[in-house]
């Protein structure tokens, strides 16, 4: 009854209006699992390869027909009649079928779409929610949301060099209350920005993209909004940053074009340490460039005991890179992006490795998203305690928050909101 009878790939649009892959996996019992694949703007050099057509006459070269063809032909033939019960075997077949280290032949977008759709079809066939199917009976932790309310870097057309300024409602008693807190701060911030004469257009992830001169200026606005909304920064709400430092690391220096400043590796580490000392910042993602290994070690030694240091471009959800980071004392947390590695099995392996090493894990969206809410279920399935899925605007972001609300309601008394315990530096 759980045998795969059809796999249907198609080209759809993501939240930026670019093509992406969607996959339906149809089972013998009539169950259908559907998954849509996200896409990043600031991508790590070591990520699995997203296959694009490259035909400039169609979608400016960003079409994904080659990936769709691979799904409908080669991948379908390899998986047809298989049972979806064995996710590990399915993912191993997909990896071997591709035959490359970075999934560049079939495309990580094709492989991931099929991998996730198989898991969803299996969950439907067993009449189980996805978080329960993947995580078992222990899956009950609702994550603290990292809400990206000010956008900069490649996510926005403004002078701010850091990519994301986020709030984390760690003091809320439930996920629903955390979401309310974030929404109230988001709308208060909009009013404060308007009052100061800034535009309130939003970036790719739904956060505001004002013309502010520096990270300090952005943090000051966020701090003011937290207070005006009736919350206490450092108690009810903590701050988090995604520097996306790889994007402004040039010739061995961190070049802040918006501030007209350049910082050495040591100066970058000290600058971030100074921000942590002056603001209630509990998490910094990609504070150093993806290949600045000495910089990562210096930053971790400097503030790793009091701040979560998340490796995104550094680790790209890859167990080999994560293992190297753990062994050499770089970062203390990993960002989990399913499309960076390309299969559900490899994603879960990265989370497990992080846990065993005492690292935290943060489930994450990409800047190019869809209405697919799989990562909400995966955050609960893995009990990772943190999710990064954008602002309180744009339905591609709120789709994940709304799914978490449903899960919390469904779990009822079993639901546990991670709160401050999600961050080892605060626990």
From Swiss-Prot:
Source superkingdom: Bacteria
Catalysis: reaction(s): (2R)-2-phosphoglycerate = phosphoenolpyruvate + H2O
Residues annotated as catalytic: 205 (proton donor), 337 (proton acceptor)
Keywords: Cytoplasm, Glycolysis, Lyase, Magnesium, Metal-binding, Secreted
Known cofactor(s): Mg(2+)
EC number(s) stated in the UniProt entry for this protein: 4.2.1.11
Signal peptide: none
Keyword 4Fe-4S on entry: no
Cofactor, free-text remark: Binds a second Mg(2+) ion via substrate during catalysis.
Keyword Cytoplasm found: yes
Sites where the protein binds Mg(2+): 242, 285, 312
Gene Ontology annotations for the cellular component aspect, listed alphabetically: cell surface; extracellular region; phosphopyruvate hydratase complex
Alphabetical list of PANTHER family matching this protein: ENOLASE
Similarity comment text for this entry: Belongs to the enolase family.
Name of protein: Enolase
Protein source organism: Bradyrhizobium sp. (strain ORS 278)
């Amino acid at each position: 009854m759980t045998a795969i009878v059809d796999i249907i790939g198609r080209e759809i649009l993501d939240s930026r209006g670019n093509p992406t892959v969607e996959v339906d996996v149809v089972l013998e019992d009539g169950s259908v699992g559907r998954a849509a694949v996200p896409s990043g703007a600031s991508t790590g050099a070591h990520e699995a390869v997203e296959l694009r057509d490259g035909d400039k006459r169609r979608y400016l070269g960003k079409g994904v027909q080659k990936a769709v063809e691979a799904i409908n032909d080669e991948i379908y033939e390899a998986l047809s009649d298989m049972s979806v019960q064995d996710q590990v075997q399915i993912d191993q077949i997909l990896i071997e079928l591709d035959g490359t280290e970075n999934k560049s032949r079939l495309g990580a977008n094709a492989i991931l779409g099929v991998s996730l759709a198989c898991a969803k079809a299996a969950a439907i066939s067993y009449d189980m929610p996805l978080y329960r199917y993947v995580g078992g009976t222990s899956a009950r932790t609702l994550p603290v949301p990292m809400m990206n309310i000010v956008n900069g870097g490649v996510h926005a057309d403004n002078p701010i060099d850091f990519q994301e300024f986020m709030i984390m409602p760690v003091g809320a008693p439930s996920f629903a209350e955390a979401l309310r807190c974030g929404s109230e701060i988001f709308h208060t911030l909009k009013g404060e920005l308007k009052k100061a004469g800034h535009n309130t257009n939003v970036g790719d992830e739904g956060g505001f993209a004002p013309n502010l001169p520096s990270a300090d200026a952005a943090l000051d606005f966020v701090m003011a909004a937290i207070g005006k909304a009736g919350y206490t920064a450092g108690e009810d709400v903590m701050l988090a940053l995604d520097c996306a430092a790889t994007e402004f690391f040039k010739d061995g220096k961190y070049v802040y074009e918006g501030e007209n400043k350049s910082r050495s590796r040591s100066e970058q580490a000290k600058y971030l340490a100074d921000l942590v000392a002056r603001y209630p910042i509990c998490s910094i993602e990609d504070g150093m460039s993806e290949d600045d290994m000495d910089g990562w070690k210096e930053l971790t030694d400097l503030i790793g005991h009091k701040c979560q240091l998340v490796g995104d471009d550094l680790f790209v959800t890859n167990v080999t890179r994560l293992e190297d980071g753990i062994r050499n004392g770089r970062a203390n947390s990993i960002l989990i992006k399913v499309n960076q590695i390309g299969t559900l099995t490899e994603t879960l392996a990265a989370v497990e490795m992080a846990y065993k090493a005492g690292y935290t894990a943060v489930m994450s969206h990409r800047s190019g998203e869809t209405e697919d809410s799989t990562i909400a279920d995966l955050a609960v399935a893995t009990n990772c305690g943190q999710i990064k899925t954008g602002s309180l605007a744009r339905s591609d972001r709120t789709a994940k928050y709304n799914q978490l609300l449903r899960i919390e309601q469904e779990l009822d008394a079993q639901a546990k909101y991670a709160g401050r315990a999600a961050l080892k530096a605060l626990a």
